[in-house]
A protein has these predicted regions:
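Sequence/structural segment immediately N-terminal to covalent heme-attachment motifs in c-type
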Residues: 40-60, 121, 125-148, 163
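Gly/Gly-Pro-rich "capping" loops immediately C-terminal to redox-active cysteine motifs
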Residues: 59-89, 95-101, 138, 150-176, ...
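C-terminal capping alpha-helices of c-type cytochrome domains
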Residues: 99-121, 165, 191-209
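Inter-heme linker and motif-flanking segments adjacent to c-type heme-binding CXXCH motifs
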Residues: 60-61, 115-128, 149-157, 175-183, ...
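Bacterial N-terminal signal peptides that target proteins for export
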Residues: 16-27
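C-terminal segment of classical bacterial N-terminal signal peptides
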Residues: 30-40
């Protein structure tokens, strides 16, 4: 019998996921280099290069469920990397990617992505949903932590202009308590949101520049 038959499913899943990740990392980096991006890549910290396959060039993700990191608060980015490494956020891929990072590595990555410019994705938001999203944001006092227009501060993330699908996923994860590395603040807020509220908020947030 093949040896893999005796291995746990999660072990095989993680191994296959990592193989797929590294394949697409290689393809993505090769594509960027082939398009004449050698100079830009030379400015990317070595440990940040692997992040680009999912989070996009300069941290601008084109993958709906993967967040853009460009322009994000450095303090927030550092804390999330640390939470992935220490198991406070549950994501097999990110846990594997952060496993070997030192504190200095995580700070360097956070600084690099915080200094990149978030590009305008020109999200085609529904005006009526945006209006309702604004009303819900005011009702739930989002600006008390995220500040006006969701620009964030320190360990509170900037979410303005974030990918629509990722915003929806994040709010649903907090509501379902699948994510809980926020000292309970977002879990408490998200528990009051309906599916419609989440959709409206995501339209509003994704429409912000």
């Amino acid at each position: 019998m093949h040896a893999s038959a005796h291995r746990p499913f999660y072990s095989l899943f993680l191994e296959n996921s990592m193989k797929t990740f590294f394949f697409f990392t290689y393809v993505s980096l090769a594509a960027m280099l082939s398009l004449g991006a050698q100079t830009a890549m030379a400015q990317v910290p070595a440990k940040a290069a692997a992040c680009l396959a999912c989070h996009g060039e300069n941290g601008n993700s084109s993958m709906p469920n993967t967040p853009s990191l460009a322009g994000q608060n450095a303090r927030y980015l550092y804390l999330q990397l640390r939470d992935f490494q220490e198991g406070r956020r549950d994501n097999a891929m990110m846990s594997a990617m952060t496993a070997g990072l030192s504190k200095a590595d995580m700070q360097e990555l956070a600084k690099y992505f915080s200094e990149q410019k978030l590009t305008n994705k020109r999200f085609n938001a529904d005006p009526e949903k945006v209006k309702k999203g604004i009303a819900k944001a005011n009702e739930t006092l989002c600006a008390m932590c995220h500040l006006g227009e969701f620009k964030g501060q320190n360990e509170i993330p900037k979410v303005a202009g974030q990918n629509f699908d990722y915003v929806v996923k994040t709010l649903k994860d907090f509501k379902a308590k699948d994510r809980n590395n926020d000292a309970g603040n977002m879990t408490s807020v998200a528990s009051t949101l309906s599916e419609e509220d989440i959709d409206n908020l995501a339209h509003y947030i994704a429409s912000l520049n």
